[in-house]
Amino acid sequence: MSEAIRLTQLSHGGGCGCKIAPAVLAEMLKTLPQAQLFPDLLVGHETADDAAVYRLNDEQAIVATTDFFMPIVDDPFDFGRIAATNAISDIYAMGGKPILALAIVGMPVNTLPIAAIQKIMEGGASVCAVAGIPLAGGHTIDAPEPIYGLVALGLVHPQRVKKNSAARAGDVLVLGKPLGVGILGSTMKAGKLDAEAYRQLIDTTTQLNTVGTALGALDAVHALTDVTGFGLLGHLLEICRGSGLSARIEAGRLPLLPAAVEFAKQGIGPGAIGRNLASFGDAVAFDAAVPEWQRRVMADAQTSGGLLAAVAPDSVDEVLALFHAQGFAAACVVGELQAGEPRVGVVA
């Protein structure tokens, strides 16, 4: 089925590479009203956090998010799995536990066979089952390009919400998954991805960030986000701006998908890399020793990427142990946060 119709050829973009560039999005959002009139809204759009959080009572807050995009892979079932995993990740990124999902489905019904659409939806439902939540309904439209995703809802204790704006100077940055998803997606779209590279792509993008719920219970985890369409640098900048801090990243410590390295050195990657780098402007400074391909990897649009945690230095081992125990073998320290103007410096 996926060989007859390549999903990635039906859309102009794929995965979180479809996101509007950070600078453009900021311009679009700047006229929206602030949330001061809603004291129970614990997290709104002000710091570009991963999900909205609304306090229900002293013990519970609801976490609400939506995420959808066009295909990053050709296989319909895998596309559904990736999109669902990516959407649910925003619940974990707030330290929450998912409880419910609704499907968002836009499909070119005159182009794409019903059987393929069914596989996409089945893929999403399979991930909800793994997460232990119902896929309780949703909404469908006839669209010119395939679009799939979820509305995801979760619960978190109001005092355990992990905002991207609560990091502290001296915090150590821990990244949970390797980078390179967008690069492999672009390679696949070009017909150059072998079976092993595809396995790496699917394994990382369908791994639920379940460790976020456990991280939410740790006082030493001060801030949390997931790395998606704006790349590592873009989402780290959101932490810096929200928390009023600067960051230092060591490029040589970054975990990378092995199959993505050579393609990155060839300059392969989604158009979102260039858009992201342009949006960062002088808020990101690279040491001269950092090669161009590594700079691009750090701006690569990740789909269903890893959690990025700002952790008190004396609890780093505990946090890494949590990641590793839940199957995030690549999790490692990649940098630190410091007092200073909101910016990111990258050294070799």
What are these regions (language model features)?
Residues 1-348:
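Helix-biased detector of long, well-ordered alpha-helical tracts
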